[in-house]
């Protein structure tokens, strides 16, 4: 990799459970970082909100702390890359700069009734055709509609709407830039996948005024500069990506046949499909990977197929914080290895309904097969197995949708630290699972994109080729049992569908 400049790249990763800042040097290495956990607000069952002001304050804190930890001056930062939890959205007053309500998080299911209305009115196929998405409360459109209905007595001329990237960009630039990128806009259920613009017919269906929405820009490119009152420097913001697209970029999955799975709060398996929109007959969604304008200002669009599984790492968090079965996430690996099998117990991780390939907003979580001989270790093992089984279903759907089957799964995210889970994943898939040394691929992708966009680095291929592999998990002797148990797990899932 030819290093074309000195200095640093600041990458912000604003996720579901916390907000992080990383400083990368010109060799593509992390020199400092900072993290702040984000408060989760559950006003009702099935509802989840974040305080957008808290996200902004935490963003400021992690930026400044990472810069101090790196012992550098803000003026040495060549560019900022931003990656965010997708779909989560809010409205704010552009005069006061204050949110009008807490942000509604992607996992929130309050708009399921509105989604059912859209389906009953026959809009599902139209929405899928235009956006590549299924009608689901997961996406931003119905959340924005709910906010517009709930918040009364405001002058819409003063209201701005956006996902978390738009909110933070607006704040970083001192209220000067109201924009988003194609990867985040493609998750709103309001952007036309072919044109890359807000779709007038969908805005009409959902009665969302176009003027409150941000301008859509290429993922790699200049979005603006930081207000000097923040860091005493006007730093260019040159990349914005949804978190899963950032991980795809960080792994070097930039062409058809390459895919990755991120095990975070949910699990997200994304396959790059090149410049073509691939439509799945197996309940996968078509989305944008990332976009970039060429020298002639033509926008090059990369598309992707995605299977979104809403609950994976969140299950482990629930074992710890909800039912207090474990004290740390790391314990799950030890406990799962303490028993020979799952003891006949199967878990369905449908805390927020089920995503791909079911898209059932009314499914709910459950343990099946509990007997008097079941130990806590069996419950923990069943949860880990369920995470892997969800991924298997999506891999099967991707294999059925693409011309050539997946040969290898590249992984990242917090739960991929779990060796039991990764080995079980290889066993059920029957293919190798590749875990890189750098687990924070999402933030790495944001940094790479920002640095490449500003000319800080000159070769994407060289950056990606630096990736180091920590371990490859090969399918083992557990494959046969894992495959047999998968059929029983699917039976458990069927029992959980349409529960409420």
Swiss-Prot record:
The lineage of its organism: Bacteria, Bacillati, Cyanobacteriota, Cyanophyceae, Nostocales. It comes from the Bacteria. Keywords: ATP-binding, Glycerol metabolism, Kinase, Nucleotide-binding, Transferase. It comes from Nostoc sp. (strain PCC 7120 / SAG 25.82 / UTEX 2576). ADP binds at residues 16, 20, 265, 313, 414, 418. NCBIfam families: glycerol_kin, PRK00047.1. This is Glycerol kinase. ATP binds at residues 16-17, 265, 313, 317, 414. CDD domains: FGGY_EcGK_like. Pathway: Polyol metabolism; glycerol degradation via glycerol kinase pathway; sn-glycerol 3-phosphate from glycerol: step 1/1. PROSITE patterns: FGGY_KINASES_2 (PS00445). Gene3D superfamilies: 3.30.420.40. Glycerol binds at residues 86-87, 138, 243-244. Belongs to the FGGY kinase family. It is an enzyme of class 2 (transferase). One of its GO terms (molecular function) is ATP binding. The keyword Kinase applies. GO terms for biological process: glycerol catabolic process; glycerol metabolic process; glycerol-3-phosphate metabolic process. The gene is glpK.
């Amino acid at each position: 990799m030819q290093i074309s400049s000195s200095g640093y790249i600041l990458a912000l990763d604003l996720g579901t459970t916390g907000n992080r800042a990383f400083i990368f040097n010109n060799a593509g290495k992390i020199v400092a970082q900072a993290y702040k956990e984000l408060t989760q607000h559950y006003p009702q069952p099935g509802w989840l909100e974040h305080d957008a002001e808290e996200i902004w304050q935490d963003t400021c804190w992690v930026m400044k702390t990472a810069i101090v930890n790196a012992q550098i001056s803000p003026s040495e930062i060549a560019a900022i890359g931003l990656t965010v939890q997708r779909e989560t959205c809010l409205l704010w007053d552009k005069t006061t700069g204050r949110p009008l309500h807490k942000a509604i998080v992607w996992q929130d299911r309050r708009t399921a009734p509105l989604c059912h209305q859209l389906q009953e009115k026959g809009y599902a196929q139209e929405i899928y055709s235009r956006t590549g998405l299924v009608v689901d409360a997961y996406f931003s459109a119905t959340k924005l509609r709910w906010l517009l209905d709930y918040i009364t007595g405001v002058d819409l001329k003063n209201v701005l709407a956006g996902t978390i990237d738009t909110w933070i960009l607006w704040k970083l630039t001192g209220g000067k830039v109201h924009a988003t990128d194609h990867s985040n806009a493609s998750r709103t259920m309001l952007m036309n996948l072919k044109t890359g613009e807000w779709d007038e017919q969908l805005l009409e269906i959902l009665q969302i005024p176009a003027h409150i929405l941000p301008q859509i820009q290429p993922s790699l490119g200049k979005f603006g500069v930081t207000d000097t009152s923040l860091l005493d420097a006007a730093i260019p913001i040159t990349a914005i990506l949804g978190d899963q697209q950032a991980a795809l970029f960080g792994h070097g999955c930039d062409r058809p046949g390459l895919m990755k799975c991120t095990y975070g709060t949910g699990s997200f398996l994304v396959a790059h499909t090149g410049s073509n929109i691939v439509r799945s007959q197996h309940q996968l969604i078509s989305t944008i990977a990332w976009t970039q304008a060429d020298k002639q200002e033509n926008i090059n669009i990369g598309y992707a197929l995605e299977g979104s599984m809403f609950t994976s790492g969140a299950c482990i968090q629930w074992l710890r914080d909800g039912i207090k079965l474990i004290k740390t996430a790391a314990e799950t690996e030890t406990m799962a290895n303490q028993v020979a099998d799952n003891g006949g117990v199967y878990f369905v991780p449908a805390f927020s309904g089920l995503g791909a390939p079911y898209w059932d907003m009314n499914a709910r979580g459950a343990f099946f097969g509990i007997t008097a001989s079941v130990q806590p270790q069996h419950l923990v093992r069943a949860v880990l197995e369920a995470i892997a089984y969800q991924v298997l279903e999506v891999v099967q759907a991707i294999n059925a949708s693409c011309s050539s089957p997946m040969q290898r799964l590249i992984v990242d995210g917090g739960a991929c630290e779990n060796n039991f889970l990764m080995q079980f994943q290889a066993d059920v898939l029957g293919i190798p699972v590749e875990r890189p040394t750098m687990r924070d691929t999402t933030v790495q992708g944001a940094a790479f994109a920002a640095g490449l966009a500003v000319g800080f680095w000159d070769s994407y291929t060289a950056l990606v080729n630096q990736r180091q592999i920590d371990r490859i998990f090969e399918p083992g002797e557990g494959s046969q049992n894992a495959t047999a148990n998968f059929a029983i797990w699917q039976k458990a899932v069927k029992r959980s569908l349409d529960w409420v």
